[in-house]
């Protein structure tokens, strides 16, 4: 290969690397500037559900037989079972009622309840093969990705649905009827949606909030 040909080859290679570097920088900047839709920022923080597994449970016996069970009836009237996979807690009461808390997904609830059912069956307790739960509350966080003026919201929204006392609490409380949830709005644009019964309730609430804010001209 001649010196000239080699030089041209090296130049072509250098240009190729330069173009790749420019392309990488362009893609990186585009990624950083890409805005996530508020509806896509939803994150389930906690799901609380209840279930009825039997008519009676001997709590002292459960506490002594199940490894890791916590029971102090002077502090709390139930046995606390903390699971690692899924990472949830089961509050078990003598009436046979169970409260599951700490779940991050509906699947975690089902898995956790089944694990509890298996533990109780191993102790000879008659537990139905199919256990069902009822969701009591879903707490979800979201991000509008833009600061919001809580004072203007307090004036513009339906006053019957608003609670805003910045000296006592930094967020604005907004009660929705459909879906029936409570939304905590913060000046940073962060939201906490609580009271949901279905996973989609949070998304519906965010869509409603966005619509209300746009109608007031507070966001574009």
Model-inferred region functions:
Residues 1-2, 34:
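Accessible peptide chain termini
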Residues 13-16, 202:
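Intrinsic-disorder-associated interaction segments
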Residues 24-99, 103-182, 188-190, 196-220:
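Intrinsically disordered, low-complexity polar/charged tails and linkers
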């Amino acid at each position: 290969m001649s010196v000239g040909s080699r030089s041209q080859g090296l130049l072509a290679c250098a240009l190729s690397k330069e173009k790749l570097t420019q392309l990488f920088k362009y893609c990186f900047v585009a990624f950083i500037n890409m805005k996530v839709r508020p509806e896509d920022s939803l994150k389930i923080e906690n799901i609380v559900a209840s279930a009825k597994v039997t008519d009676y449970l001997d709590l002292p016996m459960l506490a002594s037989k199940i490894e890791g069970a916590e029971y102090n009836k002077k502090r709390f009237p139930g046995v606390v079972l903390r699971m690692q996979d899924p990472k949830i807690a089961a509050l078990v009461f003598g009436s046979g009622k169970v409260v599951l808390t700490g779940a991050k997904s509906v699947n975690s609830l089902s898995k956790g309840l089944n694990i509890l059912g298996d533990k109780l069956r191993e102790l000879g307790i008659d537990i139905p093969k199919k256990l069902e739960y009822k969701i009591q509350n879903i707490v979800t966080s979201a991000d509008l990705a833009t600061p919001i003026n809580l004072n203007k919201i307090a004036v513009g929204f339906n006053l019957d649905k608003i609670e805003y006392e910045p000296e006592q609490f930094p967020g604005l409380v907004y009660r929705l009827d459909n879906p029936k949830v409570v939304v905590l709005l913060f000046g940073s644009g962060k939201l906490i949606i609580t009271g949901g019964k279905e996973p989609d309730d949070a998304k519906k609430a965010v869509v409603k909030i966005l619509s209300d804010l746009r109608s007031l001209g507070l966001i574009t």
